[in-house]
Amino acid sequence: MLRKEDFEPNMKTEDKIPGAQSENPAQSQRFGDFIVKYMQNVKDTMELFPGTSFQAINEIFGVLYVPLESMGELEVTGTSYNSIPKCYTYMDMEAAGASGITRLHDHPYLKLRGKGTAVAVIDSGIDYQNAVFRNAGGSRIAYLWDQSLEDGTDIAGTEVPYGRLFRKNDIDQALAFEDPFSVVPSRDTNGHGTALAGIAAGNMVPGENFTGAAPEATLIIIKVKPAKQYLRNFYLYPPDAEVFQENDVMMAIAYAISWAKKLEMPLSICLGIGSSQGAHLGTNALSQYVDYVANFSQVSVSVAAGNEGNTRNHSTGIFSQGREQIVRELRVAEREQGFTIEFWGEPPEIYELSIQSPTGEILEVSSSIGSRTQELSFVFVETKVYVNYILIERQTGYSLVYIRFFHPASGIWKIFTQARNRQNVQFHIWLPVEGLISQDTYFLEPSPYTTVTAPGDARNSITATAYQHRDGSIYIAAGRGYTPDGMITPHLAAPGVNVKVPLVRGGFGTRSGTSISAAQTAGIAALLFEWAIIRDNQPFFTGSSVKYYLQRGARREENMQYPNPEWGYGKVDLYHTFELLT
């Protein structure tokens, strides 16, 4: 287990660290990944764990690759929680007109279509053969980085740290072949990335009444590699779960920004993935990184609010004056193999927890032995429960109780919480997001609020929730705000229910979810960049600027208070934004 004070050393990005491998540690199942802020002493950690190597993400964040054999058993401690990569998954389950986009495409003076801007989609890849991503000059994709492909060349000689990179000329060459995959062997195996890229920046297809938000934008596509097996095991995910590591997403953002700079284009990034891990306070490494890059001039990050609003995967409790104990009941499905729970309690309270099995047996969680792992062994059920109690989680100041259930008995489990000092405080409990746990495992007293997934809790992101553009109703599954400390999220609502999307191998279908809303918002951001930067109306536009302009122009109902936890500042309407400017 890594305990070296969260690896916060003193070192520059250009420093070279020894640790050459015969295989790429970023892709190897023999290495564990740890996200670090490396202004302190990474070299000490590398000496502590022989065979360790380092890869910078940017001038603040980097990744340590540590051999699993020298690491010991992975566990959550006060120093390692934020270093262990969280895992993210997909947030999905005639839209363009509802957001004021098509009126701007055809406006006699504006005619905004994303020309001169770049849209990056960081997801499952893309069907690069699809006609909605091609024009008379060939592919509209400038860069396609597939992190999952193995490259047999010298690692140090490639432009990307792992996987394979294909440029527009490679893709154009592939499109001329009878078997394009013999030249560019990158595939979108589930269609999610293709759908998002189409919504954000697909070509106009009048016969299908379809258009992407920014049909003339240049595309940057990153296919994120699957999470390593050791992390999937640690988080107890189902074998078929599609999850991605935080550090790989961060690396994708960093390279997308560098390529946009080479293209000399403003960049709109789309993140249609999310996670319920963390305190929902914007302190996950990915959320912090999104905050950092969205303050850059000419970079915007649009994020899905998540689809956890109706999953019953979140519960909360408030200790008011004189209230001594709160009980939360958890129904566990039959044949549930395992799952994690994160309990986050507001400071300065000290929380005392006990867990009761379906047979009535109660075991206490110790708050006095530090963060080392506690094993709770129940006599009448075969379930093993492992707990780490972190009194002061150092990124937030909150108390974190990290609970892992192995082979949990089906039935009703109870979590008893007491406040030792009886402060007026609140706690939150989150299960994994839908798709990473059985739908029949849920809280009996859930709360739909504070369910926006990370990195939708980042302060500078544009976090998009979803609504039905045909009748104007909110998407029932959409994550709701605010954050535990009252920060406003989501920021905007965009169409995200039964939206027409391009499919892998051609044709069109429909998808729903907040990732769809995030994609449309990313395309809208590209249109704003075209107006502001390409046409020199606001040359120092940042991601935060995009958010503020869209919030100001959002459509709001007269009988509703804004912002609010369901709609944020209202329904995105770019045309109305320009009406206000005039």
Residue ranges and their predicted role:
Residues N82-C87, M251-L281, A304, R420:
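Short acidic, glycine-rich surface-loop motifs adjacent to enzyme active sites
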Residues H107-Q245, Q337, P348-E349, A458-N460, ...:
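Subtilisin-like serine protease catalytic core
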Residues D123, G306, G513:
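Active-site glycine-centered loops adjacent to acidic/histidine catalytic or metal-binding residues
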Residues G152-I155, V160-R167, T311-Y398, Q418, ...:
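Extracellular S/T/G-rich loop segment that most often corresponds to the catalytic His/Ser-adjacent loop
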Residues S268-I269, L286-Q321, V572-L574, E579:
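Catalytic cores of secreted or luminal carbohydrate-active enzymes
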